[in-house]
Amino acid sequence: MGKEKIINMIKDVLKQDGRIIFAYVFGSFIKEESFRDIDIGIYINNPDENIFVISSDIKTQLSIMAKKEKLDFSADQFDVKVINDAPFTFLKRVFKEGLLLIDHDPDLRTDLIEYVSLKYRECAGILTEGSSI
């Protein structure tokens, strides 16, 4: 099964959800030939909404679409994370290694990337020092 087909299916589902501003796929699905799950990071327009409900809704929609497309994926194989309040170290990894799937507000996304990059540079010495302990 081709990754491109899976990526297109994920894009189609995410485009239909008006709560999502931008989304990335990242992790082993992007970096390795074989993978156990598909990590998806979504930035939503209302972070006060219940992120577990949003994540569950999207996982359900992805599994329904996967079944229609004859792809062998269950909802549990989609790991959907709301990234609005994620730690900047995690966001750096998503932005650096991930593949952008949808982007309804490029200015917001690039502002967040710049903010994460700045925060990472500010704390790089502390992070390096802490990892050598």
Predicted regions and their residues:
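A short, glycine/Asx- and small/polar-enriched loop/turn
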Residues: 34-38
